[in-house]
């Protein structure tokens, strides 16, 4: 299955367990995640992982980004992926920024044509002029980022709900 839609009244954790047991995970992945799609005045944004992986490590983040890129292409769009953090390109070399940086390095090595970079703050991710001026080396240069990969479940879920609330 390429997608799985559940209702408002189903406990999410039960639904995910059933989906994993019955549908399974694609052979080329070890993990799976969720992605919300928001259609805003500034365009369509794909946000992951908003519901499943509480504290993903670099390997899980890499799978989430690959899954997101594949899902975005399913909608006839091309993913320009920002791997988000409170840090920009190694300005903090510990904790959450390090795992994001490690995931980006892995993906850039394995998929040299993938439009992905990070770790970076959301204001740089969504403002191409600011990002390109401050970080001219980025693989996202000149691109409008449309896919946001958050470092953990709390920030991803809060981020998509914030965008949803601000974009009637």
Segments and roles (model prediction):
Residues 1-168:
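Anion-binding alpha/beta catalytic cores of soluble intermediary-metabolism enzymes, centered on
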């Amino acid at each position: 299955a390429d997608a799985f839609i559940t209702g408002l009244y189903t406990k999410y954790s039960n639904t995910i367990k059933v989906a994993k047991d019955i549908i399974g995970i694609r052979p080329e992945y070890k993990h799976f995640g969720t992605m919300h799609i928001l259609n805003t005045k500034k365009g369509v944004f794909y946000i992951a992982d908003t519901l499943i992986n509480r504290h993903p490590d670099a390997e899980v983040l890499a799978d989430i980004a690959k899954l997101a890129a594949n899902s975005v292409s399913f909608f006839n769009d091309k993913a320009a992926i920002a791997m988000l953090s409170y840090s920009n390109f190694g300005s903090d070399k510990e904790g959450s920024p390090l795992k994001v940086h490690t995931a980006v390095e892995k993906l850039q090595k394995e998929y040299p044509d993938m439009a992905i970079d990070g770790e970076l703050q959301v204001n740089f991710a969504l403002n191409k002029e600011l990002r390109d001026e401050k970080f001219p080396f980025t693989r996202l240069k000149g691109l409008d980022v449309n896919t946001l990969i958050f470092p953990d479940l709390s920030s991803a879920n809060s981020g998509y709900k914030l965008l949803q609330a601000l974009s009637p």
